[in-house]
């Protein structure tokens, strides 16, 4: 019967990710021993909110990333189902699922990169600030877990409103004594993706050939595309500038309204989050000249946080770039963005300090 025992052990080992909470603590087939053979060495990544609208697609995309060796999927509901589904993909990353607050610490321990899309989505008529009351508490709890279990991890924060949740995360980490401003990155990549796409449509180019810096924040007028700095260099009429700026700023609303109550920009956001996460992993690997836009602690303006291009490296955002020359339209837009951002940042700070 030794053969049957070996077979049962193999079955338990490969299925441990489906119900990790049921693994015996003294088992020789614990989670740390569950590794696919032949996988390339890589980074350990956790997605918090993996069963949500963004999280499911993001889990799929991160499972496909060759730089990921271990992928932890956490949520308060439905995490086992998403984990089982994604784990059947024949890519190198080993997947583990974690369900509920009691398993948050296990999900986070030892992670190199933590991606947080957790929270409620936007619905028709809602602004990102309408999400604040619920999502602020979620981000606080999750970041407390990060501070305790993987204080050196790079954090990619997606949960809206990013203009407030990034300051919330910073205050949580400061309280815990683990704050490293280079490692807290608000994900604004979707604004850049939209800008590249919409500008490419106007210019008749492939979006992959276009690069539009988008600075400021991640909501409404705080989203400021710098069309004067588009690559390849291009000129636009005043009407085109107005059209492009408004469409980029309201891209999220465009999707929410088009889905008519059935969701928000989950697919494009997952794509953008995966793209930014890949950039962070390439930075961690030591690749040179990895540059993306992100909402980070900044001295570019008088505000504590601001989205600009950053150079990503082994320690996170290793360099924050200046804005560069702005035209009159952009200078006016910058002042509007800063006025709005100041209140959003303060709102996040006060949520923790109150």
Curated annotation (Swiss-Prot):
GO terms for cellular component: peroxisome. NAD(+) binds at residues 49-55, 75, 135, 158-160, 269. It is found in: Peroxisome. Residues 10-18 are annotated as: Peroxisomal targeting signal PTS2. Disruption phenotype: No visible phenotype under normal growth conditions, but the double mutant plants pmdh1 and pmdh2 show seedling growth arrest 5 days after seed imbibition. The keyword Zinc-finger does not apply. Substrate binds at residues 122, 128, 160, 194. It catalyses: (S)-malate + NAD(+) = oxaloacetate + NADH + H(+). It comes from the Eukaryota. GO terms for molecular function: L-malate dehydrogenase (NAD+) activity. Gene3D superfamilies: Lactate dehydrogenase/glycoside hydrolase, family 4, C-terminal, NAD(P)-binding Rossmann-like Domain. InterPro entries: L-lactate/malate_DH, Lactate/malate_DH_C, Lactate/malate_DH_N, Lactate_DH/Glyco_Ohase_4_C, Malate_DH_AS, Malate_DH_type1, NAD(P)-bd_dom_sf. The active site is at 218 (proton acceptor). Disulfide bonds: none annotated. Its EC number is 1.1.1.37. Keywords: Glyoxylate bypass, NAD, Oxidoreductase, Peroxisome, Tricarboxylic acid cycle. One of its GO terms (biological process) is malate metabolic process. Pfam families: Ldh_1_C (PF02866), Ldh_1_N (PF00056). Expressed in rosette leaves. Belongs to the LDH/MDH superfamily. MDH type 1 family. Homodimer. Catalyzes a reversible NAD-dependent dehydrogenase reaction involved in central metabolism and redox homeostasis between organelle compartments. Peroxisomal NAD-dependent malate dehydrogenase involved in fatty acid beta-oxidation. Reoxidizes NADH from the beta-oxidation and provides NAD for the conversion of fatty acyl-CoA to acetyl-CoA. Does not participate directly in the glyoxylate cycle. Required for maintenance of photosynthetic rates under photorespiratory conditions, and carbon flow during photorespiration. This is Malate dehydrogenase 2, peroxisomal. It comes from Arabidopsis thaliana.
């Amino acid at each position: 019967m030794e053969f049957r025992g070996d077979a049962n052990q193999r079955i338990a080992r490969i299925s441990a990710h489906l119900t990790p909470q049921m693994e015996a603590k003294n088992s020789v087939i614990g989670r740390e021993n569950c590794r696919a053979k032949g996988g390339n060495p890589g980074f350990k990544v956790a997605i918090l909110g993996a069963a949500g609208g963004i999280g499911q697609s993001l889990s799929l995309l991160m499972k496909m990333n060759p730089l990921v060796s271990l992928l932890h999927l956490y949520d308060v509901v439905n995490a086992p189902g998403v984990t089982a589904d994604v784990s059947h993909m024949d890519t190198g990353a080993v997947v583990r699922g974690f369900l509920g607050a009691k398993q948050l610490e296990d999900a986070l321990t030892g992670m190199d990169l933590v991606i947080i899309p957790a929270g409620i989505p936007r619905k028709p008529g809602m602004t990102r600030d309408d999400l604040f009351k619920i999502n602020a508490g979620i981000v606080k709890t999750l970041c407390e877990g990060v501070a305790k279990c993987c204080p050196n991890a790079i954090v990619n924060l997606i949960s809206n409103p990013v203009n407030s949740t990034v300051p919330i995360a910073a205050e949580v980490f400061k309280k815990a004594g683990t704050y490293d401003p280079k490692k807290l990155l608000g994900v604004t990549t979707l604004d850049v993706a939209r800008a590249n796409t919409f500008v490419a449509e106007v210019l008749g180019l492939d979006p992959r050939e276009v690069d539009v810096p988008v600075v400021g924040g991640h909501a409404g007028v705080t989203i400021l595309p710098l069309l004067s700095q588009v690559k390849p260099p291009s000129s636009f009429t005043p009407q085109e500038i107005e059209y492009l700026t408004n469409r980029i700023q309201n891209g999220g609303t465009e999707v929410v309204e088009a889905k008519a109550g059935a969701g928000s920009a989950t697919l494009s956001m997952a794509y953008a989050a995966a793209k930014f996460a890949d950039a962070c992993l390439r930075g961690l690997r030591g690749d040179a000249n990895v540059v993306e836009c992100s909402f980070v602690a900044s001295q570019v303006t008088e505000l504590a946080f601001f989205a600009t291009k950053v150079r990503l490296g082994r320690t996170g955002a290793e360099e924050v770039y200046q804005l560069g020359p702005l035209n009159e339209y952009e200078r006016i837009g910058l002042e509007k963005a800063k006025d709005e951002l100041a209140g959003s940042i303060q709102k996040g700070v006060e949520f923790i300090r109150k």
